[in-house]
Amino acid sequence: MIGNETDLHYKVVDLIRRYYPDSILVAGLGENQDTENKRLDSYKKGYMREQPDLMVLDYHKEYKGLCIEFKSPTNNYRVSKAQYELMNKYSNNGYKFILSNDYDEICIEVHDYMKGIRLPCKYCVKHFHNKNTLETHYRVIHRLSN
């Protein structure tokens, strides 16, 4: 049972790690900003207020990354003006942005996003669907062995 935003966050991360273990995940640390010293330290290290809860940074054919903002599954939430501005900022810069409290909806969006993931060749401009095709490309085109 998903009782709160944290449960939802954990469950989505578990899904991504299970089905897409090589994905590059970056978690926002907003919930950990509970003291003035932590907030100041995080700000100096580059943390932004209203940063997305989770980002997937794998190379995608259409997007620069996937941003997910989790909301409480109890339907007892509101979206702040700053969060709308954040969504627009990331969307306008080429990121796919999901704001949701629905695990099933998030799963569908994540799986849909992952279909567009491509692995770039380090030696040319081509991109590949999976490691096997990339490794074959390295062997055949660039004459590289594992």
Residue ranges of model-derived segments:
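Short Cys/His-rich metal-coordination motifs, predominantly Zn2+-binding knuckles/fingers
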Residues: 124
